[in-house]
Amino acid sequence: DRPAQYLRNTYNTEEELYDVVMEIAKDYEKAAPEIIEWQDFDTDVEMDVLILAHGVVSRSAQGALPLLKEQGIRAGHFRPITLRPMPEEQMRRAAAKAKRILVVESAYGQFLKLVKQSLYGMDKPIDTLLRPGAGVTAEEIADRIKEGR
């Protein structure tokens, strides 16, 4: 057996803790513009659909762009690299040029929730292709977009 450990809060009052948390929040807000990363593909023109995908699913989204272009569908892809901080302004600029949005993820809506929060107030239909724990191919993305036309 070992001797008992007596743990105590580092801060004696809630006010002390509040001050520290607010200082950390201020530092985060100051650093956020330097931390934000994203990539966008073909989002500089009006689009029929904007594909939003994060992580490995983005490779399939990029692969879907030429497939859609062959079929006369103007598509762009926005990939947030950082999710916190989320590149909200950049995502909103891209979304503003699209008639609708397709959120693709290999999870069950966690990324979708972040997207909805970031695009709150925009009048854009949002479709989804959610494949929890499974990969998504470029062909599946293109097929989902064609279904929604």
Positions of predicted regions on the chain:
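Peripheral docking tails and interdomain loops at the edges
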Residues: 99, 105-149
